[in-house]
Amino acid sequence: MTQDQLKQAVAQAAVDFILPKLDDKSIVGVGTGSTANCFIDALAKHKAAFDGAVASSQATAARLKAHGIPVYELNTVSDLEFYVDGADESDEHLNLIKGGGAALTREKIVAAVANTFICIADGSKLVPVLGAFPLPVEVIPMARSHVARQLVKLGGDPVYREGVLTDNGNIIIDVHNMSITNPVELEAQINAIVGVVTNGLFAARPADLLLLGTAEGVKTLTR
C-alpha cells in the first residue's frame, strides 16, 4: 500500500470507531494535515450523523466548510467527545511530536478539551524514541533569539522556519538533533521558556488511541 492509501485506511478506521458513538448533538474536534484531511473527507459522507466540528486551523475549517460540515468556535462548545488528528512521530506510549504543519498550539488546545484523542498515522510514524523529526516550537516573534539560545542549552539545534507564520501570528523554530527520552519533562521545560507559546510535544496530554496504518492492516494501540 502507498502512504496515501495507508492514510486513507486509518482515516476510515477513525470514522468507523467514532460513528456509532455520535448523535445529532455531537461535535467532533478535527486536526490539521494530510492525514486529517483524509479523515475529513471520510467523515463528510456521514455529516448527517453529527452536529458539526471544531477545527484546529483555518485550513481545516475551510475544508470542513467545503464539505458542508458546520464549524464551531471552541469557546462555544461545552463538550467535545473526540479529537482526531495525525502526528509526525509517536512512541509506544502514544507521546507525540506534532506541528509539521505549524498548527500545534490550536491542535494542543482542542486535544486538551476532548475526552478522547485519537491519533491516526501510517506505520512509519511509530518510533522507539521521539526526536528524529525536528520538534516544532511556536514562539512570539520578538523572543526568537532568546528562545533559540535557551533551546541550545537544552541540547537542541534550533532552526528558524523561514517564511512561516502560524494562524496566531507567531513564528516556528524547529529543534533538530534531540533524542527525547523524557517527553513529559522536556515539554514542560520548553514551555517554561519566556516567549514560547507551546511546543510540538504532546506528552502531558498524549493520544488515548493510535490507529496505525500498516501493510497488514490498521493496528490499534492504546496507552
Swiss-Prot record:
GO biological process, any: D-ribose metabolic process
S-S bridge residues: none
Matches recorded under Pfam families: Rib_5-P_isom_A
Enzyme class: isomerase
Active site annotation, chain numbering: 107
Superkingdom assignment: Bacteria
Molecular function per GO: ribose-5-phosphate isomerase activity
Pathway participation: Carbohydrate degradation; pentose phosphate pathway; D-ribose 5-phosphate from D-ribulose 5-phosphate (non-oxidative stage): step 1/1
EC number in record: 5.3.1.6
Keywords associated with the record: Isomerase
Residues bound to substrate: 32-35, 85-88, 98-101, 125
Cross-referenced InterPro entries: NagB/RpiA_transferase-like (IPR037171), Ribose5P_isomerase_typA_subgr (IPR020672), Ribose5P_isomerase_type_A (IPR004788)
Catalytic activity: aldehydo-D-ribose 5-phosphate = D-ribulose 5-phosphate
GO cellular component: cytosol
Subunit structure: Homodimer.
NCBIfam families hit by this protein: PRK00702.1, rpiA
Chain's role: Catalyzes the reversible conversion of ribose-5-phosphate to ribulose 5-phosphate.
Family statement: Belongs to the ribose 5-phosphate isomerase family.
HAMAP family named among the record's database cross-references: Rib_5P_isom_A
The name this protein goes by in its record: Ribose-5-phosphate isomerase A
Organism of origin: Pseudomonas syringae pv. syringae (strain B728a)
